[in-house]
Every structure is written in structure tokens, then in C-alpha cells.
Amino acid sequence: MISLPLTTPILPSRCLLHKTRRQNSTRRRLLIRSSSSLQDQFTVETTKRVVLVRHGQSTWNEEGRIQGSSDFSVLTKKGESQAEISRQMLIDDSFDVCFTSPLKRSKKTAEIIWGSRESEMIFDYDLREIDLYSFQGLLKKEGKEKFGEAFKQWQEDPANFIIDGHYPVRELWSRARSCWPGILAHESKSVLVVAHNAVNQALLATAIGLGTEYFRSLLQSNCGVSVLDFIPRADGGSPHVCLNRLNQTPNSPLAGGSSGGRKASKQIILVCHGQGNNEDSAVINQAANNDQAMNMLGVIHSQKTAELLLDLRVSSIVCSPKTASIESSGVISRVQEAAGCLGVDNVPHYVKTKQMNELDVESVLRKSNKDNDVIASQLDEEAFSALWNRSEKAWESLLDELSDEKSNPGEIMVVVGPAMTHISLIAQCLNLTKEALGLFHLDAGSISVIDFPDGPSSKGVIRCTNYTAHLGRWSIPITKPA
């Protein structure tokens, strides 16, 4: 597991967005000047964990109708089943309070998940879904036919989308930002928030300082669970905010579906290698000095991950040149190839595998290690920059391979490496700066999924991060023990 210390937290001062096309394998970064960050707006006295859940499938979800903040749709039977699965997933978790949107589809989901808990439920109208004005109630094809260019802008440039004199996404970001003081001021350590797709995106983005340009970059599926940690600083300033996990769904995150209404043409699956010998759960203990093999728990992690990936036909595996990553990738490739021979058609499935030196962060840590107990933010500036530059090269190389003309539509690439490497790749995907590495947390054996609905030359969509449900009894609980 990788997390950053509280003494010198790394926070995003500015967020960046890249052009949709890479030129000469070098992305141009455009500065987003956004006031969406909460960093200067509040403090917390104790650590707070906020768990966000999107409502289950609604009747209008099923029909493909634009809901917005209307309150006509209700949960389908599938939606109620999804909410029940989420209830079971969260049944042993400790919550002090539940905030929810009062719209029927969200309210019903919250009631199912909350179950027999005696703690209070707070209905907050500001947690309603995005206001879409004249779009609301239309089938998506009707919106395209009736509104033409406006509907195209909603699909392609939602941050600047305007309808009926309103900018819905900008209004949503402002409303989400205004929700946080009330949520965090509540005397509770663990908060459940049940709301909607777009408003949950806005809550996540405003918490970690991302602007409206990131709308549809952090996927929120029906009954998907996301977790934010707000950790007080010793100096009493604004808290360190960390996205512990994103979009943990009732079913497998590899089960398909769309990203923001679009089918992913290609995917990158980030697999944190199985736990190695001497690895501590909170720090990289001795990893800088030892090329560790996996311990028995790490072997179990890898086997569980390989089983999960049987839902997909993996095209290629790229891994760090370190032993634990090589071992994990070997387990995945062997299971993939064996499954091909055991299939109905009995067709051998060859998985292309390779090692990539740029995925090796241990060598960077080793150069900076002085006491065999290295945490990322304790790196000196030179080593920190070297780690970031290496991850940028790795990300560009991965995109180049995925963009290869010889690659097939729907290609799935699995990338195996340590948690810090994958945190860096997620930040690269979102085109953030190196100061944003403290925004994310990954555990050993977890997977994170990046979709490319418009191809790898365009913006990636984070489908989920730090998914561990496939690890069974070794999975990481949603909330911390009471």
C-alpha cells in the first residue's frame, strides 16, 4: 500500500489539461485557472472519511432519457438489486451520518444502503443532479435532433456547454463546492453521501482541486462507491485530501459498459503487483534497497487478479523489470494463455509481454534512500523530479504502444508495477503536475482501469482506482474499523 505522510503533504496548486492530440510524443499542457479547489476554504479537526455512492439504475437510465435534476424516474428492479449489493458491501462499515439528495432515485438508494442504522439521514437539495433545463426528459436521440449544436457541445465540450442562458457544469461545480463545508462541519468521522453521477463527479473534483474541464474524467457508475480522506494538518491549515478509491462497483469494473456514454475503444489496466517480502502496509519499507520477490500474500494477490482478468482477453502485458512485477505479470499471462486453450474453441491465446525500464521507480528511490524507510514526499527535489520524469516517459511509451497501427480496436493492455508507479501514471493520464501525487492512494494487489473512448491519442477516463474486491477475504474494507 502506498500513501504519503502528513508532515509534508503534496497538494495540487494547479491542475493541467492536455490537448486531445499528442504532437511528436510530447503533450502540450494548458493551465486551468480554476477556483474549484477547497484547500483554502475549510479545516478539519480530526480525520474524516467521506464515502460517495451514486444511486442505482433508474427507469430513465434504462430508457436512455436525460434526467438532470428532474424527479420523475425511480429505481428499477436492477437498481434496487444494485443498492442491495452496495448495502451488503457496506454492511460492516461504520458511518456516523448519511447525506443524500432528496430526489426519489437517490433517496431510495440511500434508504436501502442505510438499512436499520439509527444514525440520522440528512436530505440536502444541493446534492441533486446537474440542472439540464430544456434537455431534461428527452431521449438522447431527441436531444441531438432538437438541439443540434448545443447537444454536440454537451457531448464534446461540457465545461462550456450553455443552454437556456445557463452553464450547467459551471453551476454544478459551484454547487458541489458549497456542499463541502456542511458535510465536513458535521461532528462525524465517517460520512456516507448518496447522490448522482454528475454531482458526485463534481464533489470529487472540487475536493481534490480539479476544474470543470475534468467533467466525465472520473467515472461514476450506478451504485459505484468512491472514498475521500480529509486529514488535518499539524499546523491547523487546510486538510490533506486523498482519493482513496474511485468507483468501486457492485459488479466487476471489467464487466464493460460505457465511459461517459461512450464505449471504450481501448483500455489500460494498472495492476499493483502482489505484496513483496518486507513490505509494510503504509510505507515502502526497504523496497529501495531490495529487488523483492513476492511473499505468499503477494502470490495470492496475483492469482486473484489473474482470475479477475479472465473477464477480458488481454492483448499485452507491460511490467516493471523488478522481480515482484515480473512474477505478477507471469501469473497473469499464464492464466490468460491457459484459459484460451480451455475455451470452447480451444484456440491458443498468446499474450505479448515486455519489461519497461521506465516503470521501475525503485531505482530512483534507492538513489535517495538513507534510512531504508522511504516515503515518496521525503525524496529530495532531484529524485522526486527524476521519478516524475520517468513516469512521463513511461506514459508516453504506453500510449505509443496502444496507438500502434497494428494494434486492434478494443485492445487491452495490462501494466504491472508498484503502487507509486501507478499513482504517477494516473496523474499523467489526468495531465496533472508532480505535486498531485499525494492525491491518490493504491494498495498492493489493487487494479485501476483507464478507458480511452476516443482512442489513446485523446483524453483518458479513469473508470476506477484501487479496486480490491476481487481479493476476497484479503480485500481492503471501504471504511476504517470503528
From Swiss-Prot:
GO cellular component: chloroplast; chloroplast stroma
GO MF terms, alphabetically ordered: 2-carboxy-D-arabinitol-1-phosphatase activity
Active site: H55, E129
Annotated family: Belongs to the phosphoglycerate mutase family.
Lineage of source species: Eukaryota, Viridiplantae, Streptophyta, Embryophyta, Tracheophyta
Superkingdom of the source species: Eukaryota
Function: Phosphoglycerate mutase-like protein lacking PGM activity, but having 2-carboxy-D-arabinitol 1-phosphate (CA1P) phosphatase activity. Prevents the accumulation of D-glycero-2,3-pentodiulose-1,5-bisphosphate (PDBP) a potent inhibitor of ribulose-1,5-bisphosphate carboxylase (RuBisCO). PDBP is produced during the oxidation of ribulose-1,5-bisphosphate, the substrate of RuBisCO.
Keyword Electron transport appears in the UniProt entry: no
Sorted UniProt keywords: Chloroplast, Hydrolase, Plastid, Transit peptide
InterPro entries associated with the record: His_Pase_superF_clade-1, His_PPase_superfam, PG/BPGM_mutase_AS, PGM_Phosphatase
Pfam families (alphabetical): His_Phos_1
Compartmental location: Plastid, Chloroplast stroma
Transit peptide: 1-34
Broad enzyme group: hydrolase
Species whose genome carries this gene: Arabidopsis thaliana
EC number(s) on file: 3.1.3.63
Entry annotated with the keyword Hydrolase: yes
Catalytic activity reported: 2-carboxy-D-arabinitol 1-phosphate + H2O = 2-carboxy-D-arabinitol + phosphate
Name of the protein in its database record: Probable 2-carboxy-D-arabinitol-1-phosphatase
Main location: plastid
Signal peptide residue numbers: none
